[in-house]
Amino acid sequence: MVTYFEDRAIYLFNICCYDMKQWRLFFTIQWTITTLQLMRFLSNAYIQYNWTSDVAEVFMQIADFVTEIPFASAFTAYIISASICLGCIAFAVFTALSHHFYQWVVPIILMRYILFWFPVIYFPLVIPHLKMILSCFSYTIESYTIHPFYENVTCWSGAHGGYFGLSIVVATILCVSQYLIISCFYDSEMPSGTSLAAHSYVARYTALSDSMMFVMKTILLILYIGGHTPSWRYAMGFLTFLSGLAAAAHLLYTMPHWHDTALLLYTFQALLLSWTGVTAVLMTALDDTEGTGMLYFVMLPVLLIAAQMAMQWRIRVVGELSARELTNGTLIITKIRYYARVYFQWLAQFGDIYIEESEAQTRELMSCFALVEDTLEAGLRRFPDNTDLHIYTTQFFRRQSQPRARLSFAESGRERSEPNS
């Protein structure tokens, strides 16, 4: 049964991945929204931190707007969330069936946009159901306690049991769908071409870091909602700090994004999550919400600089790794990423202009190809079971044949144009 649903999901992703490129504006919007959703862990929405800083209050109001369904009461948001979730599942089934039997294209186009934006709306959809599931475990059946988040529901009453069951189903569907989308539906194309502006921001060779971040965010969200009392502030602060630190370390180790800007922003996002945990601990220990709140936002540029320095340090370390130090498939690909980055930096010196093929450009490209081929050959020989390495190898040799074919054509053209001696 599990394999059947996995096959259907892969089929849906395959028909929707005809174009995985994403506008940089959309990438920036999505990154900003998900960052605000992480910052909201420090708001009063889950655990009371009682902000007194005006700047913090404004930011948290914006974070509230993008993290939960706005302009709706708690119970209305619950109904909207369940309806959207079930509607998306029904539309996905309709898309797959209409394409399979009638080759309809329009549903695929719409489904592609839903898959792109689903990671952004995951928090607003799942939070109402986690609130329904988790918030009554602190109370007994005999207490007849009003639900902490839904005033018209009594904990462990018959109505609560029905909503509880529905929320279990919807939350499970949302979590599994989000995990599959993050793990399978992403731009895995390696960068190519001399136009650096055309390189995708979101391209990456693996989704392991994104999947890890998703799992940690979901666990933190469950704990924040389940432990919504002030006594949890220290524990949740430490857990948030460790989660962000682990996410940043994993990003820097794997370096999954081909574009430095994307890697920098996601590393900054992970450090911000870690700093959110530190601020929660300081706010609780010092009992100073105004001063600590200002410190939280003052440190944001420092975190960005720290992310940039950490990324540059990691790039330098990877560049200095010898062949015997490449002890796993991930390090093999990070080494290849370093070679590609060196070549694209060489191209960057000419600016964002059209570059004619020249002997210098051909020499640099062939040098990069040679280094990548040698590294791939050694990697496949030492780590034959690494999936990401096999996927990249297939893409590399498919892409490599295109510039080499153009070079051969150009050389033959030059030979024909030369006078006979």
State where each predicted segment sits.
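Short interface patches used for recognition in eukaryotic signaling and trafficking proteins
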Residues: 113-120, 357-360, 395
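General secondary-structure edge motif
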Residues: 113, 195, 248, 359-360, ...
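Solvent-exposed, well-ordered amphipathic alpha-helical segments
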Residues: 197-203, 207, 365, 394, ...
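Alpha-helical transmembrane segments
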Residues: 249-263
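A general structural-boundary detector
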Residues: 120, 142, 202, 255, ...
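Extramembranous, membrane-proximal N-terminal regions and early juxtamembrane loops
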Residues: 1-245, 260, 264-267, 271-306, ...
